[in-house]
Structures are given as C-alpha cells and as structure tokens.
C-alpha cells in the first residue's frame, strides 16, 4: 500500500531493481500470515539490510538519514531529554536549532518516541533515521552501557529493597545476561563493594564497567543467580560452581557460574559459552596461509601428539575445538577429557574431570584408551603422569591433542624434558607445538594509517630506519570509542624435524631449539604480529603489550 499517496516501498524496490515481482509477492504473503511492516519482511528475507531500508524510507517519507558515527552531539543537546526516556524509547537528540529538535529514531513510522520527545522538551521535533546498531552504540557512548532503569526517582526515605521485588530482580538478572551477549562479552563480573554492586563485562579481553547497582539488593541478586545455576542459596561462606542454560532472542547461551565469598558479600563470575563462537575456521582465528597449511598437514596421519601452548585466556581451547571440528568424521571416534567442558561439540564424546569422584586427567586418559579412540583431546597436561600417558597413547596409534603453559613453542619441548619424559619418546611422538596469543583487532570503521615511531619500532625489534606502516583505531560509535572490535590470534608453529629431534635427544636448551625452528622457516609470534600490524589487523601497542619487548 502506498503511504500518504506516495509510491509504496515494494514499488520502489522493483523500480530500482532490488527485487522482482515474484519476490514482492512472497513478501506480501508473509505479511498476510504475520501482519506487520513490509520493510521488516524485506529485511527478514534478505532483500535489503537496515541501512538500505532507511535510505528507501528516507526517499519515500522525505525524512533525512544520518550516520551517527560521523556526528558529535553537544552535551547541552543530550541534556534536553532525560536518560530514562532516551533508553526506553530508543531515541537520541542530535541537534537543536531555535525551537526545533532533530531526533534520531530507528522507525520513523512509529509516532510514540517522537511524541515522548515532544512532551519532554516542549519543542518541535523533526526525526532523522538511523540504524538500530548506531543508536545503541551512541547511547552506550554518551550515557554508558547499562540499559536497566535506575532508581533515580526514589526519595531519600525510600527503602531501596522495596523497589526491587522478586519480579524486578529476575528482570534485572536477565537484562544483565542479555546485554552481555550484545557486547560479545566473554565474562560477567558481579562484585559487591562497600557502597554498591559493580557489574563489569570482559570485552575483547578487557574488563569494562557496565553498571552500578544498590548494595541493598546484593543478597537478592546473588540468590537469583544461584537459583538459575542450581546452587545452594543458603551457602554463602564457601565457593560454589554452577551452570545456567539461558534462552534469549539470540539463541541458547551456556553460562558457567562461580561464586566466591569476599569482604562485602559473594562475588560472582559468569563465563559465557557460545558454540558458534568456538567453531571458527583456522583463517578466521588468524592463521596466515603458510602456517595454516603446515598445521593442517601436521594433522594428517593417525598418530602423534600436537600441543598448543600459551597463557590462560589466549584461545588455546578455541583452537583445539576448531581443529576437532575439522577432523570430525563418521568413520573416526573422537574422545576428550576436559576441566571443564567449555562447549558441547556435536559428534564428539566429551568427559569432564571430577577429582571428588577420582576422575583426573591421568585416570580418565587410561579409561579413554579402552574406548577405541582415534583422536584424543586432553584439556591440559599438568603433571608428569598425564604427559607420559598422552605420549604413550600417541605411540600406540592415536592422534593426541593437548595444551601446555609455556611462553613460546620451543620452551614447550623443554617443559616436557623437565617433566622427566624420556627424550626419545618426545622426539618420536610430538609432531609440533603451536604457540599463540590473542590481540585486539582494530575497528574497521575508524582505522587510520600512520608511520610507527622509532620507539615503537625498537620495542618490536626493528631499527629506526626500518619502514613500518601501522594503523590504529581513532574511536567511533561502532567500537564505543575504544578503537578496537574483536580479537585475532598470532601464532608460532614449531614442527618436529631431524635437527630438532637431535636437540631434544641431547636435552638442548629452549633457545637452541627455537633457533633451529627459525632456521627451518618457523614464523615467530613477533613476526606474525608484525604481519598483522602491517595489514592493519592490530596495533603496535597490542603486539608489544602482549608479547613484551623483542
């Protein structure tokens, strides 16, 4: 239907060649089954994205569009509308001229937000169209990340606890988890303090403040969390662990919950696990073509051990899960022993360490060997017994994967030697060691090029006269002014060869094994980091802070 005598959106799309008559008929059929807005149907069918839809609406309604990422809003304009209305209506004042206010909206056909702004300001309101992502990011930038309405209207005599009944506590906890998904957080921290409760999200490896809540609701909030995680709400003096399966519009989310008693109450950390985030291709993880080729070649064959090395939180488990997903096939049996199981992998037999029941990595590995496995993943080799069992499993015709905590690939061999593993067992079973780190990606929306300073070059092992074109993020709405968005891995793959085998047999120190690897063509962590700096994936600062001085 045409709007106010104007050409209909469907007709506009056909005229521009965006869709054909058959696609329009399909959209109209869907609209008849589920009444709503035709533009949303076009989006759902993939005929156009939100920004394209806004452009057509702008032509149809003669309402301008605006890219908030390129626009800085004055503080006096932001103060014209209370924050609670901004958040509730998903609007943003952007410009004021005399008695007219330009208002950013996502749906110009919805009069409710426009009327709310008109009533709040007493001004004439002219809408401008923006995308949902832009307005969400702008609200984050100007008002902070929290979206839960505060208790600002409470009087001094109001009992804060009375404002947060059971229903409101449930809504609050659901809101915290839902928002953490939106920001692609890996962890949620709920921290009681003397005067309040601090909520923080770990985003791209860094903790960021999300919200401060009244300290009076601490007990109710943690109790709600314990109920969701099937934990003992009466136990407050001991640490507890639990699990939550949370359903949201974005899909099912698996949360691992840990509580810990502190001075001002129980602190809680939730680890967010999403299987779709774990099963990436090696290229998506950050493998360069040469390293990817060598790594996948190393997977050929039905025996040997592959170790992934690095500190906690550097993505080792994600690399192993992506590797197992690549190997998964109906004709092989993949078995894992983990602590804990971080993701539920399809067609993989996963088991968890349970020390109370006597199930350790070593004891589980003994049992796994009687399960006719082809591929075995041991979450971590922590002691001599486990590593010896893993190596003997590799000797008897199994492909074994595990992780180890060392600074680089070469010191992985020295760690094995320090565990008193026979050198000939190491040289005959270890196919290679992959060392890795995670660095933050530069936001593509605000990335700018510059020439690295002499100090930056020296920090990365270069000479001042060396050319190093670098990039950084200037900060924008898309990255919440951080300059970064997402993370990428940097890798160092040391493959076993005759020279390294002889060095291992002679108990050579790590630096000699490393030098032999470099002579054989190994790309070091620093070299891989420099590749990603020059390509604009990450910054000199990220690589230097992650790896240390060269």
Over which residues does each language-model region extend?
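Short, flexible helix-loop junctions that flank or precede catalytic/ligand sites
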Residues: 164-550
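N-terminal, intrinsically disordered, highly charged
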Residues: 1-266, 271-278, 282-284, 289-290, ...
């Amino acid at each position: 239907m045409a709007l106010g005598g104007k050409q209909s959106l469907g007709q506009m799309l056909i005229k521009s060649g965006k869709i054909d008559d058959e696609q329009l008929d399909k959209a109209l059929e869907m609209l008849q089954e589920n009444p709503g807005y035709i533009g949303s149907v076009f989006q759902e069918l993939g005929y156009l994205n939100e920004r394209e839809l806004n452009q057509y609406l702008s032509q149809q309604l003669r309402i301008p569009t605006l890219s908030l990422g390129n626009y800085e809003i004055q503080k006096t304009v932001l103060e014209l509308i209370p924050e609670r209305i901004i958040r509730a209506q998903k609007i943003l004042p952007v410009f004021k001229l005399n008695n007219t206010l330009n208002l950013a909206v996502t749906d110009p056909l919805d009069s409710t937000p426009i009327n709310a702004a008109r009533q709040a300001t007493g001004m004439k309101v002219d809408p401008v169209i923006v995308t949902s992502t832009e307005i969400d990011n702008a609200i984050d930038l100007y008002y902070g990340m929290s979206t839960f309405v505060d208790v600002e209207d409470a009087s001094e005599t109001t009992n804060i606890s009375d404002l947060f009944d059971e229903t409101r506590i449930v809504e609050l906890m659901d809101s915290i988890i839902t928002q953490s998904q939106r920001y692609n957080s890996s962890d949620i921290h709920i921290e009681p303090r003397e005067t309040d409760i601090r909520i923080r999200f770990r985003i791209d490896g860094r903790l960021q403040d999300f919200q401060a809540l009244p300290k009076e609701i601490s007990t109710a909030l943690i109790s709600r969390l314990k109920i969701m995680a099937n934990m003992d709400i009466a136990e407050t003096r001991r640490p507890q662990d639990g699990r939550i399966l949370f359903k949201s519009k974005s899909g099912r989310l698996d949360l691992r919950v840990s509580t810990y008693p502190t001075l001002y109450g129980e602190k809680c950390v939730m680890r967010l696990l999403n299987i779709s985030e774990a099963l990436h291709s090696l290229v998506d993880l950050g493998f360069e073509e040469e390293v990817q080729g060598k790594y996948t070649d190393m997977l050929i064959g039905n025996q040997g051990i592959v170790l992934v090395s690095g500190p906690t939180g550097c993505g080792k488990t994600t690399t192993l899960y992506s590797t197992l997903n690549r190997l998964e096939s109906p004709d092989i049996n993949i078995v894992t022993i983990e602590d804990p199981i971080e993701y539920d992998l399809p067609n993989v037999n996963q088991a968890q360490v349970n020390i109370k029941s006597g199930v350790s990595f070593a004891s589980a590995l003994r049992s796994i060997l009687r399960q006719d496995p082809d591929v075995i993943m041991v979450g971590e080799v922590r002691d001599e017994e486990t590593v010896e069992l893993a190596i003997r499993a590799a000797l008897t015709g199994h492909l074994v994967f595990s992780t180890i905590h060392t600074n680089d690939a070469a010191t992985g061999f020295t760690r094995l030697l320090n565990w008193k593993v026979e050198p000939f067992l190491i040289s005959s079973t270890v196919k290679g060691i992959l060392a890795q780190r995670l660095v933050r990606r530069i936001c593509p929306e605000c990335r700018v090029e510059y020439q690295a300073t002499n100090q930056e070059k020296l920090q990365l092992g270069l000479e001042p006269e060396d050319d190093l074109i670098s990039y950084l993020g200037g900060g924008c709405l898309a990255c919440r002014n951080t300059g970064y968005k997402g993370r990428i891995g940097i890798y160092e793959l040391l493959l076993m060869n005759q020279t390294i085998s002889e060095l291992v047999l002679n108990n050579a120190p790590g630096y000699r094994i490393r030098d032999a690897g470099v002579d054989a063509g190994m790309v070091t962590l620093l070299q891989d980091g420099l590749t990603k700096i020059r390509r604009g994936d990450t910054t000199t600062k990220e690589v230097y802070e992650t790896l240390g001085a060269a």
